[in-house]
């Protein structure tokens, strides 16, 4: 998951409607038990309504209600498992960090927070619900980063090999938008089960070749991680996409359908939805310095922010120097001894909130205090430059591509492991009980 790509407003189009008359309403019920947590029927209904509303707005067709319900329940199960893991390790996105994220989103949308609130209200969405949905999305991104990142290793040999390939391609690569359908098989399947899954996959393939809508088919038939999005994996180049895709799309063009491809997970059908060329570009680097204070049982969130506000006053009045305060107070061991200096770097190497803050500053400007996952910061943008650091760019790019590919693969492995270890029971709706 890329934390810097914050949710746009459409993702918060929660389809929550209230009855206009006080008619008797059925009692809510427990629809799914997940370990010691539950999913209510109303949550499933709300998400189904959201998917339908978004599909209608995008003029997309949908499968049967039962197929859609299955996909929604699976999404809610995986979401709840991740949130339970976040609770277990004490991961919590506080109000101050949430406010900072909202300010960043408003800035990206080129509006104030008040204007953003008005826009959200005009779409019939409660701002408090927007906040809580954003808090959940940030939590999911953080728990995925914490749990999956430590499972990934990128070797120097992998980087060297990919750098060579990038150099040979002259950075003129292609990005693909991939459609993916997975027809799964049970664990330790019998030959009859394998044959049944194979027949299902071939039937799906024939329907697609006959012109059936891919997105609708994926929602109805796929067990893959992107099923609820119509099976669509957004633009990736061959070096960052899951290995399975990379191995089969070489030479493929837009519109090609590939498969079924058998793996241990089942039978895969892949369609090239779109392809676009990549272009080389100059690298913009920034030289910055910062002061970091980490909230703790001794140092509260409010106190950390207040201290940085006081530092700002001292720096602006000439009472103190940035570098001296950084050496004395900053809790970033890598930069404190250097007066807070971070050196030249691309902004994208930093956590999203830090990168966004740097991008908003002019040279010599010092930010207001802001929160990241590391703690509270103030940062000064000292210089910007554009450079033709091709070798370093290729190395960084290679590492990023390999990491993203492995992250996507390990994320799915982690989710599968959590699901396999969890107690999950799906209760049938009243209308289906005999």
Curated annotation (Swiss-Prot):
Q: Provide any one GO MF term from the record.
A: unfolded protein binding
As for subcellular location, the record says: Periplasm
Question: What is this protein's function?
Answer: Chaperone involved in the correct folding and assembly of outer membrane proteins. Recognizes specific patterns of aromatic residues and the orientation of their side chains, which are found more frequently in integral outer membrane proteins. May act in both early periplasmic and late outer membrane-associated steps of protein maturation.
Q: State the top-level EC class.
A: isomerase
Q: Gene3D superfamilies annotated for this entry?
A: 3.10.50.40, Porin chaperone SurA, peptide-binding domain
According to its UniProt record, which reaction does this protein catalyse?
Answer: [protein]-peptidylproline (omega=180) = [protein]-peptidylproline (omega=0)
Q: What is this protein called?
A: Chaperone SurA
According to the UniProt record, one GO cellular component term is: outer membrane-bounded periplasmic space
EC number(s) per UniProt?
A: 5.2.1.8
Q: Which gene encodes it?
A: surA
Q: Which InterPro entries does the annotation name?
A: OMP_Chaperone_SurA (IPR050280), PPIase_dom_sf (IPR046357), PPIase_PpiC (IPR000297), PPIase_PpiC_CS (IPR023058), PPIase_SurA (IPR023034), SurA_N (IPR015391), Trigger_fact/SurA_dom_sf (IPR027304)
Q: Per its UniProt entry, which superkingdom is the organism in?
A: Bacteria
* Native source species: Shewanella oneidensis (strain ATCC 700550 / JCM 31522 / CIP 106686 / LMG 19005 / NCIMB 14063 / MR-1)
Q: Any domain commentary? A: The PPIase activity resides only in the second parvulin domain. The N-terminal region and the C-terminal tail are necessary and sufficient for the chaperone activity of SurA. The PPIase activity is dispensable for SurA to function as a chaperone. The N-terminal region and the C-terminal tail are also required for porin recognition.
Q: Which residues form the signal peptide?
A: 1-22
Where do the PpiC domain residues begin and end? 173-274, 283-383
Predominantly, its location class is periplasm
Q: Could you tell me the keywords of this UniProt record?
A: Chaperone, Isomerase, Periplasm, Repeat, Rotamase, Signal
BP terms from Gene Ontology: chaperone-mediated protein folding; Gram-negative-bacterium-type cell outer membrane assembly; protein stabilization
Fetch the SUPFAM superfamilies from UniProt. FKBP-like, Triger factor/SurA peptide-binding domain-like
């Amino acid at each position: 998951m890329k934390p810097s790509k914050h949710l746009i407003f459409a993702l918060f189009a929660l389809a929550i409607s209230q009855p206009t008359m006080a008619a008797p309403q059925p009692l809510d019920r427990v629809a799914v038990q997940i370990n010691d947590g539950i999913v209510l029927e109303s949550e499933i209904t709300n998400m189904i309504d959201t998917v339908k509303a978004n599909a209608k707005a995008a003029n997309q067709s949908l499968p049967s209600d039962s197929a859609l319900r299955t996909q929604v329940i699976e999404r809610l199960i995986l979401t709840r498992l991740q949130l339970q893991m976040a609770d277990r390790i004490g991961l919590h996105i506080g109000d101050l960090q949430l406010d900072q994220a909202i300010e960043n989103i408003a800035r990206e949308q080129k509006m104030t927070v008040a204007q953003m609130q008005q826009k959200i209200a005009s779409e019939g969405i409660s701002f408090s619900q927007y906040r809580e949905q954003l808090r959940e999305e940030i939590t999911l991104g953080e728990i995925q980063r914490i749990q999956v990142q430590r499972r990934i290793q990128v070797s120097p040999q992998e980087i060297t090999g990919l750098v060579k390939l990038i150099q040979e391609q002259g950075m003129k690569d292609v990005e693909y938008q991939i459609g993916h359908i997975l027809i799964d098989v049970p664990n330790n399947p019998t030959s009859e089960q394998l044959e049944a899954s194979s027949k299902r996959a071939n039937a799906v393939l024939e329907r697609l070749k006959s012109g059936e809508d891919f997105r609708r088919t994926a929602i109805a038939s796929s067990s893959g991680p992107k099923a609820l999005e119509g099976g669509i994996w957004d633009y990736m180049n061959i070096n960052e996409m899951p290995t399975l895709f990379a191995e089969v799309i070489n030479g493929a063009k837009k519109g090609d359908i590939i498969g079924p491809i058998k793996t241990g997970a089942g039978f895969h059908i892949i369609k090239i939805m779109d392809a676009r060329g990549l272009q080389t570009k100059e690298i913009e680097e920034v030289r910055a310095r910062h002061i970091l204070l980490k909230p703790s049982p001794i140092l509260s969130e409010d106190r950390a922010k207040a201290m940085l506000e006081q530092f700002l006053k001292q720096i602006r009045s000439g009472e103190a120097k940035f570098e001296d305060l950084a050496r004395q107070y900053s809790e970033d061991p890598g930069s404190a001894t250097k007066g807070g200096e971070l050196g030249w770097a691309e902004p994208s190497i930093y956590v999203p909130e830090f990168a966004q803050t740097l991008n908003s500053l002019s040279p010599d400007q010092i930010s207001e205090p802001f929160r990241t996952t590391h703690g509270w910061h103030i940062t000064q943008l000292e210089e910007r430059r554009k450079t033709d650091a091709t070798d370093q760019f290729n190395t960084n790019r290679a590492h990023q591509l390999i990491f993203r590919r492995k992250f996507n693969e390990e994320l799915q492995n982690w989710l599968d492991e959590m699901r396999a270890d969890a107690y999950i029971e799906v209760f049938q709706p009243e209308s289906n009980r005999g």
